[in-house]
């Protein structure tokens, strides 16, 4: 069984919920930061149809958060995920007030691509909202939370009534068996409305009034929006789910296809059958076997080998995208082995005889993961009430916003009330991030395989992005009704 603390250094807690905690951690071999969701087996009372980890194992799309590794112990399950560099769509819109149609279209097309991929895989999200969508600094979108997701067969009806009230489709609030993909389409409509107005279409002082608004299907839309956009919003939020379009049909709507630009390629980040020889060779110097690397990627084992390869590949791709300057090396930081400089090969072999336990977790994850700042200073952030699988209730949270430097963050629970961060387990393998613990930075990208692999150890870095939030008032609304 793999040892978590032998592979990762815990830095700080960035989210906490009823049966799980999200930590910021550093991968020891590469220095990369990751988000780690720790789930206590004894506290997992939630029981969805399919667990979040199983859905993430199935998903491989450039606009869906990547699961890198799963480590299971007797008491806990560790989900190691990529850490996005950006902030939530909610924060992004709060900073801007609302988005212009061109920017909204660019982001929305990525959401459509991801959700079309999910629906083709039989995956239903059921909790799409701006908090669960990350926007990276380059404008790339990542859907990060599948805690309420499940897998369905064509024509299968669902009866677990969950989600977030302002984004819930009428059929969910009526407690009727529903078509999973169609409620995702409704939610996409609410998200699109929020993107171009800065507000949700349905808002009320109480849950009862909010439910009545949604069931009545009456909402306001700014008169400044184009005719095509208003038509698309109306289609997405069609009250009758049978008349609501599929995601594939939405992708050919005139507003979506307007202008240049293509949809993200679902194959963009799929694992190659053959790993990069340079990375394999570099990993071989610290005990990884080439055949094990290839098998781990091809079979998507989500083990130490797969995580190490993916993190190294991401570092190299990031390094290719921007020039960097050299900095003095921290003597306390061990450089990653280079194929050229054999003096760096004083690392012990990382391989152990045992491989990670094969894992198919029971369906019991109900915690959402959203972006959260690792900085000490935070703004206030707003959270919408949720629809529970139990009797409907409101999850009370404070109205606050917060900037993020890298992404996975706060935990929302549709079933568990959010709890303040506790010290329990926070010291388990915990190591505070030191200001002196800075990676090596090189002058440029050398040519050739040897130069390429030499860069592997010099690409660790820390990013910081602090953007103040502001609100903008909006006027000029006209009442419309969704198509019946």
UniProtKB/Swiss-Prot annotation:
Testis-specific. Expressed in the testis from 22 days postpartum (22 dpp). Residues 356-400, 422-450 are annotated as: Disordered. The active site is at 127 (proton acceptor). Residues 8-256 form the Protein kinase domain. Residues 272-314 form the UBA domain. Its EC number is 2.7.11.1. Keywords: ATP-binding, Kinase, Nucleotide-binding, Serine/threonine-protein kinase, Transferase. ATP binds at residues 14-22, 37. CDD domains: STKc_AMPK-like, UBA_MARK_Par1. Residues 356-373, 422-434 have a biased composition (Polar residues). Gene3D superfamilies: DNA helicase RuvA subunit, C-terminal domain, Phosphorylase Kinase, domain 1, Transferase(Phosphotransferase) domain 1. GO terms for molecular function: ATP binding; protein kinase activity; protein serine kinase activity; protein serine/threonine kinase activity. It holds the Pfam family Pkinase. May play a role in sperm motility, especially in the regulation of flagellar function. Encoded on the T-complex, a region of 20-30 Mb on proximal third of mouse chromosome 17. Naturally occurring variant forms of the T-complex, known as complete t-haplotypes, are found in wild mouse populations. The t-haplotypes contain at least four nonoverlapping inversions that suppress recombination with the wild-type chromosome, and lock into strong linkage disequilibrium loci affecting normal transmission of the chromosome, male gametogenesis and embryonic development. This is Sperm motility kinase 2B. It comes from Mus musculus. The lineage of its organism: Eukaryota, Metazoa, Chordata, Craniata, Vertebrata. The gene is Smok2b.
